[in-house]
Amino acid sequence: MTTRQPLYKSLYFQVIVAICIGIALGHYYPQFGVAVKPLGDGFIKLIKMIIAPIIFCTVVSGIAGMQNMKSVGKTGGYALLYFEIVSTIALLVGLIVVNIVQPGNGMHIDVSTLDASKVATYVAQGADQSVVGFLLNVIPTTIVGAFATGDILQVLMFSVIFGFALHRLGAYGKPILDFIDRFAHVMFNIINMIMKLAPIGAFGAMAFTIGAYGVGSLVQLGQLMICFYITCLAFILIVLGGIARMHGFSVLKMIRYIREELLIVLGTSSSESVLPRMLIKMERLGAKKSVVGLVIPTGYSFNLDGTAIYLTMAAVFIAQATDTHMDITHQITLLVVLLLSSKGAAGVTGSGFIVLAATLSAVGHLPVAGLALILGIDRFMSEARALTNLVGNAVATIVVAKWVKELDTDVLDAELASGGRGIADTRPEDDLGVAEGPTPSNVK
């Protein structure tokens, strides 16, 4: 048994302390609180620095790493169809809830105090954007240019094309895929390093927010967080619960079955931490190896329901807080962009914030500097994101397996009825080879 990490070394605890200090500093010494704003800005710039390579590695590895494309084509098609439908529903749920509750209304954050030059650039980009221009802009002028400018949609498009081309090379392209996998490990290590600075960034961002706008602004941030948790819970029980019921099983029994994995995710804020166990458990529920091996790893990039809810709610919250007008056209544009950019997310702590930063840049209408408003509470919303993502992928695996008639329903019923008893003591590493298909180590 591993030694428990001291509380003071926990990132969760460090961020809590940093936020409390930031609130106190901003309240009692508002001028100094405003002065430490660069700490939050610097952290955001570090996050933006790795957006392009992270998305490239995740998407390319997920596509090029697929085995036996012809034999799993039907399963892959159904899986992608399910992912798109449910992800769209999740995005719409977040969009509807944040428009009804409007947690950011009344904050009246002055955008110019956040970063006037950047806001002017994004507003100009949004004003110049037509539908045709937007679609043409997805195609990069040069590959290097897409990565140099950090244009998320251009990077995503090139990554998809590169992934398919690499897959067509077969064994000849494997050295390149191996290199990308190793490069991805480096990128995710950089994420881990950057996330260690989260307390400093959260301190600077919260001190500035309270120093510039008062303690009252914290109430709105709390409303966003509570609203998000309730929305995720409702999505699991109503949307995923309804999908599960239509396919002959209970989402509550599924939650009970994967309760240990949920607890691990709750502690780590990363659904990646239970990937090997999920491969084992989904097969033991009666789904075929080929289905589990395709749906679970692919879902870690393409089926992130909790992240989808977070992205729409956070983006519109920033618009509400900064009094940035968003009409129906802007919100539809946001939805379309998120349908693409959310596929570059990964199940690691901070990935939702990374994709949010990329999305605000791609939309062009919302101030990226507004990310500073939610930096302090983003860490505390990551648990709900990760838990919702995990339940969503568990449900997706069973649903897709049933669609392609690769599910033993008798085994499913028996295992769910048992609640997973007897599995807890099994070491996941004993069965890492149970699932066939893509298990890229960098898909989080």
Curated annotation (Swiss-Prot):
Database matches in Pfam families: SDF
Matching Gene3D superfamilies: Sodium:dicarboxylate symporter
GO CC terms in record: plasma membrane
Region listing for Disordered, in residue ranges: 422-444
Compartment(s) of residence: Cell inner membrane
GO molecular function: fumarate transmembrane transporter activity; malate:proton symporter activity; succinate transmembrane transporter activity
UniProt record, GO biological process: L-aspartate transmembrane transport
Main location: membrane
Keywords: Cell inner membrane, Cell membrane, Membrane, Symport, Transmembrane, Transmembrane helix, Transport
Membrane topology of the entry: Multi-pass membrane protein
Annotated transmembrane regions: 15-35, 46-66, 78-98, 143-163, 199-219, 224-244, 291-311, 332-352, 354-374
Source organism superkingdom: Bacteria
InterPro entries (alphabetical): C4_dicarb_transport, Na-dicarboxylate_symporter, Na-dicarboxylate_symporter_CS, Na:dicarbo_symporter_sf
Stated family: Belongs to the dicarboxylate/amino acid:cation symporter (DAACS) (TC 2.A.23) family.
Known function: Responsible for the transport of dicarboxylates such as succinate, fumarate, and malate from the periplasm across the membrane.
Annotated protein name in UniProt: C4-dicarboxylate transport protein
Lineage: Bacteria, Pseudomonadati, Pseudomonadota, Gammaproteobacteria, Pseudomonadales
Gene: dctA
